[in-house]
Amino acid sequence: MAELGDYKINYEPLFGPLQLIDVGEAIKRADHPWYNQTLIEVGGVLLRLGVFAGGEYHWHKHQEQDEFFYVIDGRLRIELEGRDPVELAAGMAFSVPRGMLHRPVALEPTQVLMIEESGVAVTGD
Protein backbone atom coordinates (compact mmCIF):
# COMPACT_ATOMS: atom_id res chain seq x y z
CA MET A 1 0.00 0.00 0.00
CA ALA A 2 1.14 3.54 -0.68
CA GLU A 3 -0.30 6.80 0.58
CA LEU A 4 0.78 9.54 -1.78
CA GLY A 5 -0.50 12.88 -0.65
CA ASP A 6 -4.25 12.69 -1.05
CA TYR A 7 -4.36 9.15 -2.51
CA LYS A 8 -4.38 5.66 -1.00
CA ILE A 9 -3.16 3.04 -3.47
CA ASN A 10 -3.22 -0.70 -2.71
CA TYR A 11 -1.06 -2.49 -5.29
CA GLU A 12 -1.42 -6.00 -3.86
CA PRO A 13 -4.34 -7.82 -5.57
CA LEU A 14 -7.27 -8.42 -3.25
CA PHE A 15 -8.33 -11.55 -5.16
CA GLY A 16 -6.68 -14.40 -7.03
CA PRO A 17 -7.73 -17.00 -9.60
CA LEU A 18 -10.78 -19.10 -8.75
CA GLN A 19 -11.98 -16.58 -6.17
CA LEU A 20 -15.35 -14.87 -6.38
CA ILE A 21 -14.82 -11.13 -6.82
CA ASP A 22 -17.50 -9.21 -4.96
CA VAL A 23 -17.00 -5.63 -6.13
CA GLY A 24 -19.71 -4.34 -3.77
CA GLU A 25 -17.86 -5.78 -0.78
CA ALA A 26 -14.57 -4.36 -2.09
CA ILE A 27 -16.19 -0.91 -2.30
CA LYS A 28 -17.14 -1.17 1.39
CA ARG A 29 -13.44 -1.57 2.27
CA ALA A 30 -12.63 1.92 0.97
CA ASP A 31 -11.17 3.89 3.87
CA HIS A 32 -9.87 6.99 2.13
CA PRO A 33 -11.47 9.80 0.07
CA TRP A 34 -9.41 8.81 -3.01
CA TYR A 35 -9.04 5.03 -2.68
CA ASN A 36 -7.48 2.73 -5.28
CA GLN A 37 -7.37 -1.07 -4.89
CA THR A 38 -6.02 -3.66 -7.31
CA LEU A 39 -8.71 -6.36 -7.44
CA ILE A 40 -6.95 -8.99 -9.56
CA GLU A 41 -4.21 -9.52 -12.12
CA VAL A 42 -5.13 -11.62 -15.15
CA GLY A 43 -2.58 -12.33 -17.88
CA GLY A 44 -0.47 -9.28 -17.09
CA VAL A 45 -3.48 -6.96 -16.90
CA LEU A 46 -4.76 -5.34 -13.70
CA LEU A 47 -8.39 -4.77 -12.79
CA ARG A 48 -8.42 -1.94 -10.26
CA LEU A 49 -11.20 -0.36 -8.23
CA GLY A 50 -11.37 3.36 -7.56
CA VAL A 51 -13.66 4.70 -4.85
CA PHE A 52 -13.62 8.49 -4.93
CA ALA A 53 -15.46 10.76 -2.49
CA GLY A 54 -15.23 13.60 -5.00
CA GLY A 55 -12.58 15.97 -6.25
CA GLU A 56 -9.76 15.75 -8.73
CA TYR A 57 -6.68 13.63 -9.31
CA HIS A 58 -3.53 15.33 -10.54
CA TRP A 59 -2.62 15.73 -14.23
CA HIS A 60 -0.55 12.74 -15.33
CA LYS A 61 0.15 10.35 -18.21
CA HIS A 62 1.29 6.79 -18.76
CA GLN A 63 3.97 6.70 -21.45
CA GLU A 64 3.77 2.97 -22.15
CA GLN A 65 0.19 2.01 -21.31
CA ASP A 66 -3.40 2.84 -22.17
CA GLU A 67 -5.89 3.30 -19.33
CA PHE A 68 -9.54 2.18 -19.36
CA PHE A 69 -12.23 3.59 -17.05
CA TYR A 70 -15.68 2.04 -16.42
CA VAL A 71 -18.02 3.92 -14.06
CA ILE A 72 -19.97 1.65 -11.72
CA ASP A 73 -21.77 4.48 -9.95
CA GLY A 74 -21.47 8.26 -9.80
CA ARG A 75 -20.07 10.67 -12.39
CA LEU A 76 -16.49 10.98 -13.59
CA ARG A 77 -15.10 13.68 -15.86
CA ILE A 78 -11.84 12.91 -17.61
CA GLU A 79 -9.99 16.05 -18.59
CA LEU A 80 -7.64 15.61 -21.54
CA GLU A 81 -4.81 17.81 -22.75
CA GLY A 82 -5.81 19.57 -25.96
CA ARG A 83 -9.28 17.98 -26.11
CA ASP A 84 -12.71 18.54 -24.64
CA PRO A 85 -13.32 16.71 -21.36
CA VAL A 86 -15.39 13.54 -21.37
CA GLU A 87 -18.12 13.00 -18.76
CA LEU A 88 -19.04 9.47 -17.76
CA ALA A 89 -22.08 8.30 -15.81
CA ALA A 90 -22.82 4.83 -14.42
CA GLY A 91 -22.47 2.18 -17.11
CA MET A 92 -20.24 4.31 -19.34
CA ALA A 93 -16.59 3.67 -20.22
CA PHE A 94 -13.67 5.50 -21.84
CA SER A 95 -10.10 4.66 -22.79
CA VAL A 96 -7.20 7.12 -22.54
CA PRO A 97 -4.36 6.27 -24.94
CA ARG A 98 -0.79 5.98 -23.73
CA GLY A 99 1.14 9.22 -23.57
CA MET A 100 -1.95 11.45 -23.23
CA LEU A 101 -1.95 13.89 -20.32
CA HIS A 102 -5.21 13.48 -18.40
CA ARG A 103 -6.89 14.08 -15.05
CA PRO A 104 -9.89 12.21 -13.64
CA VAL A 105 -12.34 14.38 -11.68
CA ALA A 106 -15.04 12.77 -9.52
CA LEU A 107 -18.03 15.11 -9.81
CA GLU A 108 -19.72 13.32 -6.88
CA PRO A 109 -18.99 10.14 -4.91
CA THR A 110 -17.97 7.73 -7.68
CA GLN A 111 -16.89 4.10 -8.05
CA VAL A 112 -14.83 3.13 -11.08
CA LEU A 113 -13.22 0.00 -12.51
CA MET A 114 -9.93 0.62 -14.31
CA ILE A 115 -7.98 -1.72 -16.57
CA GLU A 116 -4.24 -1.26 -17.06
CA GLU A 117 -1.18 -3.35 -17.75
CA SER A 118 0.66 -4.78 -14.76
CA GLY A 119 3.47 -2.54 -13.54
CA VAL A 120 1.66 0.70 -14.32
CA ALA A 121 2.60 3.68 -12.17
CA VAL A 122 -0.88 4.60 -10.92
CA THR A 123 0.19 8.19 -10.32
CA GLY A 124 1.68 8.47 -13.82
CA ASP A 125 5.16 8.42 -15.32
Walk through the language-model features, giving the residues of each.
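Glycine- and acidic-residue-biased ligand/ion/polar-headgroup-sensing regions
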Residues: E64-R77, E81-G82
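A cytosolic small-molecule/anion-sensing beta-strand core signal
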Residues: I72-D73, A89-A90, E108, E116
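Ligand-binding loop in jelly-roll beta-barrel domains
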Residues: R98-D125
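Short beta-strand segments in beta-sandwich/barrel cores
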Residues: L47, Y57-W59, G74-E79, A93, ...
